[in-house]
Amino acid sequence: MLLGRARDTVPLANARVVIHHVTRENAGPVDSMRSDARGRYRIELRNPDSSGAYVVSVWYDSLAYVSAPVMGGGRPLVHVDDIIAFATTVDAPPIYLARRLATVARPSDAGTREVLEILELENRGGTTRVTRDTLRPTWAGRIPQRTGQFRGGEGDISPEAVRFRHDSVLVFAPIAPGQPKQLSYAYSVAAGTRTFVLPIDQPTAALNLLVEDTTATVRAPHLESRGTQAIEERHFAAYSAGPLAPGDRIEIELPAGKFHPQALLPYVIAVLAAGMLVALVWALRRRPASPRLSA
């Protein structure tokens, strides 16, 4: 166990270390102990269960830090990589957007398009960034206009820690230093959208874009075409851009979607109504005059 600091790490002594057994159906603690003065620990499992994996966790400054899963069946000794814990701070350090990937699908039968975004959020400081309340997230970013049906996806940041408010996606999960944390979410673009814009509201080191409509036109600063990529028997035009600055725009000119006869219904009704009105006026003009009564 190690305690992370601004420039180095030190042993985390006397920390309570818990080993958990995890399967697809359930998870729970198996055993625990305290780390020694050098931050080391040794937990003996007499009958390791090979039906799942084991993870080691440690609590520090109100947060749990968890190791990578290890398989315990059939091996007398398993090494677990060091877990590095950090002190927590509110409103700092800043969280950087290291990479953004957006995948834009073809229109559905309803004319809407599904977009999946994967972001990599990076904490370059020496403490774990946490939130004070539900009003001040640990990170926030703009989402495109003419979109809806937002939902969080799988990644390092749980969907339960993601909120969508007005024109923004908000993250309330703690973000620790080290490797960038992956955030994913999806949404639908309104039917009939011809120009789809990804707004850039903060410095973005790199952006990758996949567009299933390979005839779409993409405009962005420092844009490079990466050819066509095949993913699960679907073909996408690939692009990269960056670095990007606040105020930059990624514009995608989309081709017209599928023809939907129901989209013409309002116009058909209007034409029929106009035709009926003309017929009524014509009929009134053609109606013979009333016969006069003779005295």
Model regions: which residues?
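Lumenal/extracellular ectodomains and adaptor appendage modules
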Residues: 2-294
